[in-house]
């Protein structure tokens, strides 16, 4: 087999971009403790071991796809933190590969710039290392736009099937698909209207479509079957299929009421809010922020395909700005189209001057993203003063969980240790201790029937109430689970943990 080194050399920049992206998303992947949401997602995947399927809940605001991906990853590789995060990492890297495919429409320089900006983006790296749904939604949103442009420019059947498959996967991922699909659809009449005051150049008329009615029936028929398959819990719970439309009432209510996630400090006029723009500026998402400005260029006569992307991107940003519910990881659903727009403007400017001038423009932008991204992901990943660090579990949790897991892994009988966790909010602990069979979880209004447990966790404010009930010697470990939660105290039975922790018990009951 002969290797075409000339062809390989031509693709070296793309290979380098992907390798950098993989490194930033995989290196020290378990350095950051499991997030609250990761614990919930992992717990849902764990329940599939008991029930055999994922029982869809329309009030959970997330589709079933990520839970099945996590279940598969943990089944293949074990219940490890890196395995929990592996599906999201895969989706994040595939998103970069998908952006590179836009060279078919916008040329290689624009596609490479967009992919490199995503590879280095602090947000895409930070949340690409989280086991949450958003990375999947980004991937499928990119593929939907790719399919739309493909149908527009070539009309090929493959783009019809890609469109159906990508929309289906968006629906399976998160209810915000309505927002993204809505923006893509509404951008069409806006594009058609705007051509009158500002004619496009070039216009790119709709290509002759090569697909048939049978292709449409096949593509969307298969999509419907796939949706029913996953939402019905692999055909085991058909009543859950109604959640496909029931979820939107709950999602709309949460989106408007915000549930403590509103960002009123950034309000402008009425429902308008500049939180996302402020986040781009604060968190070194400068390529995307300049991409917002670059999008204004397409108000003037310009390539109608870029104009369509600009309208869609602006509509998505506007929609997320109006919605009251704002969590920082949603930003990755908005950034990527602006990379394409900035790349297009840079490519246009450089073509009129000198290609080397590109690096004088691009390097400071990407260097800022890389600097902050490395600092955020590998040094200050639990610092609450950082906007992307949001209800993140503190490293303190390891002071409690590591001794428990160490004892359990050294002796299989350790997974039979009894525990009582008495916290109002205790995730990600149920996922961390998912292999233990005798742990009870209690809220502030309930207590265990006895106190003779191998480990106990309480709010520190209840120490004086709980300690008189302890009948064994315990080591006392204070820790903070996350911001917004009171300090916690863990009690580890001395007869189980004294050697592991390496100190004498703090509490010794009187005979």
What is each model feature region?
Residues 2-356, 363, 367-368, 376-377:
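Membrane-integral, polyisoprenol-dependent glycosyltransferases
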